[in-house]
Amino acid sequence: MKIAILKKPYCIEIEEKKLKAKLAPDEIRAKTVVSALKLGTDRGNYEGAEDVPGAPTYPRWVGDSNIAIVQEIGSEVGEFKVGDRVVSQNPHQSEWIAKESTNICTIPEGVKDEDAVWSTLYTLSAYCYTKANFIPGENVAVVGLGILGLGAVAMGPIFGAKKTIAVGNSEVRNDMAKKNGSRPFCFK
């Protein structure tokens, strides 16, 4: 399989790696179709930021959100079958093996790969509502309109926010937030 490895700042290489041939009973093997960048973290890794969580030294793998097709399943796997489209939190690699119990989820029919690939990041946005003990009917202010902030804006109506106020410094991102029902406030 091939995997994107960040060797040093501004230097990504595609490496060939061997996956084990035999699966454990609770593992699946899948082939990646689409992989998404984690925009802030991957950019920080690429630019050599010192404070990227979980990545203290080089080489670093990048990415943690991909869409794949299940190619093979272990003898005890019950949730997935060969041919299933799944979303996972694996790095940018062409093929992977993971335990059935890890963060892997079947993608419903009708959901495009390009939309589903963001779902792992949007779960972080949704978690903000849980962590804040949000109560439906309250107002929400989202400060920062990166991918996680825009996800939090999109989650406002789903969680029952009365109003969602989006605070950012980009006209483009404020427009995106507005399309999701927020009232943008732009700092320049």
Task: Show which residues each predicted segment covers.
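A short beta-strand micro-motif
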Residues: 3-7
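NAD(P)H dinucleotide-binding glycine-rich loop of Rossmann-like/cofactor-binding domains
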Residues: 59-67, 71, 79-143
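Mid-domain Rossmann-like dinucleotide-binding core that forms the NAD(H)/NADP(H) cofactor-binding site
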Residues: 112-187
